[in-house]
């Protein structure tokens, strides 16, 4: 029986590389996957997932008006698995569509994303995935500064100073965000 998985972790926890690995494993067995990513994440190129170690793959971009269920139901042959990157950027309705894919099409869905933002508040997509996922799995990495387990994301400005207010979504990578533990989020050892 198919399930909805939410695999969440801080920055640099290997979420995208895990998607690429899972896709490879399915395809190695002559099974098909449908890969989606946020249409607002344009760090590399819209419609692609790209890992920090340089691996890249095409993916269907999700925008506010995208109906993920309708896209998946029309894929022939029916995919054996649906994979999503940057799922923190999903909207509530998108999460309901993912649950519908699992419940009505019996296709497993694995969503990967951040749980919380730089203010340590939940993203909309993460909130509803936490509520509706059948299985929650934490992907771990270490704090940028002290090597404890990273559970938060620290945003820094162009001068490298910590930022705790502002718009929730600002697309960026290691130049503006760091995986950190709770202690280093509150008092980052930045000069």
UniProtKB/Swiss-Prot annotation:
Keywords: ATP-binding, Cytoplasm, DNA synthesis, Kinase, Metal-binding, Nucleotide-binding, Transferase, Zinc. It holds the Pfam family TK. InterPro entries: P-loop_NTPase, Thymidine_kinase, Thymidine_kinase_CS. The active site is at residue 86. ATP binds at residues 9-16, 85-88. Zn(2+) binds at residues 143, 146, 181, 184. One of its GO terms (biological process) is DNA biosynthetic process. It is found in: Cytoplasm. The keyword Methyltransferase does not apply. PANTHER family: THYMIDINE KINASE, THYMIDINE KINASE, CYTOSOLIC. This is Thymidine kinase. It comes from Listeria monocytogenes serovar 1/2a (strain ATCC BAA-679 / EGD-e).
């Amino acid at each position: 029986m198919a399930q909805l998985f939410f695999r969440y972790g801080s920055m640099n926890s290997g979420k995208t590389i895990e998607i690429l690995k899972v896709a490879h494993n399915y395809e190695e067995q002559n099974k098909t996957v449908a890969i989606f990513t946020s249409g607002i994440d344009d760090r590399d190129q819209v419609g692609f997932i790209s890992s920090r170690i340089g691996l890249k793959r095409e993916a269907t971009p999700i925008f506010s008006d995208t109906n993920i269920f309708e896209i998946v139901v029309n894929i022939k042959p029916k995919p054996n698995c649906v994979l999503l990157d940057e799922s923190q950027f999903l909207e509530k309705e998108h999460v309901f569509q993912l649950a519908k894919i699992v419940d009505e099409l019996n296709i497993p869905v694995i969503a990967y994303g951040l749980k919380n933002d730089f203010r340590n508040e939940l993203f909309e997509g993460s909130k509803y995935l936490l509520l509706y996922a059948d299985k929650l799995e934490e992907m771990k990495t270490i704090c940028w500064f002290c090597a404890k387990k990273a559970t938060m994301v620290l945003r820094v400005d162009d001068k490298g100073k910590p930022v705790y207010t502002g718009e929730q979504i600002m697309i960026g990578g290691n130049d503006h965000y760091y995986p950190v533990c709770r202690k280093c989020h509150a008092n980052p050892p930045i000069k």
